[in-house]
Structure formats: C-alpha cells, structure tokens
A protein has these predicted regions:
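N-terminal mitochondrial targeting presequence
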Residues: 1-3
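Short, amphipathic alpha-helix enriched in basic
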Residues: 6-42, 46-51, 60-67
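Hydrophobic alpha-helical connector segments
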Residues: 16, 80-119
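Residue-level detector of well-ordered alpha-helical segments, enriched
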Residues: 22, 39, 65, 69, ...
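Short, basic, alpha-helical segments at the C-terminal edge of helix-turn-helix-like DNA-binding modules
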Residues: 70-76
Length: 121
C-alpha cells in the first residue's frame, strides 16, 4: 500500500489492520446504506482512506465487512476485559461482563446488526 493512498496514522497499516480500523465506520454507514460499496466508500472517505485501497481490504464484500466488524468488537472486548482481570472473577461474573460488553458494543448499531444478520442468514 502506498503512503499516499491513506491519510494520517492509517498509512502504515496492513490491509488486515485497516479492516479493523474501518469496520466501525462501515457499520455506522451500513445503517443507512447497507453492507456494501456505498457504506465502504463512505467509511473510507470519512477516515481519509482512498476508497480503492479500502476495497482491497474487503475482497469478500459484505461478509468480509461484517466479519471485520465482529473482529473489531472482539479486539475491543479483549482490551477492555483482559484475561488477567477475567481470571480473577467467578465464572458467572465473567460471563455477565463478556455478554454485557458485546451487547453494549452492538446497541448503538442495532440496524447495522439487523442488516448483518439478514446477510449472514
């Protein structure tokens, strides 16, 4: 990926890393535009990424975008609830916190989640 293709801190990212960075913005755009090229382009432009480079990060289209969004939520959850913290908790509390985190992460994007489930069904 060329340095001129992506703005700011995103210039040095691999395509896999770029996927994770773009995923929340794509989910936000998917509320209005669905999980497709329009949402991808809107997210890329909002983050200062060349839409052509962004498209390279999602060769599988909507499914890749949805998988990246889920992976980003998983990564955020792992950072917020590290194993060292979870290991000290009773199993019920671990489950409660993990499920709670996932529900809170999806709440602002209920429509994106509905659209994602329709694609994955």
């Amino acid at each position: 990926m060329s340095a001129g293709a992506v703005a700011g801190d995103l210039a040095d990212l691999t395509l896999d890393e770029l996927r994770l960075e773009l995923a929340p913005a794509i989910a936000d755009a998917a509320v209005f535009d669905g999980w497709g090229k329009v949402a991808l382009d809107a997210a890329a432009e909002a983050m200062g990424v060349d839409p052509a480079v962004a498209a390279l990060a999602f060769p599988g289209g909507a499914i890749d975008m949805i998988e990246a969004w889920i992976a980003r939520i998983d990564a955020d959850m792992a950072r917020a609830l590290p194993l060292e913290v979870l290991a000290k908790l009773p199993i019920r509390e671990r489950i409660r916190r993990l499920i709670g985190f996932r529900l809170e992460a999806a709440t602002p994007s209920k429509e994106a989640l509905r659209r994602a489930l329709a694609i994955m069904a």
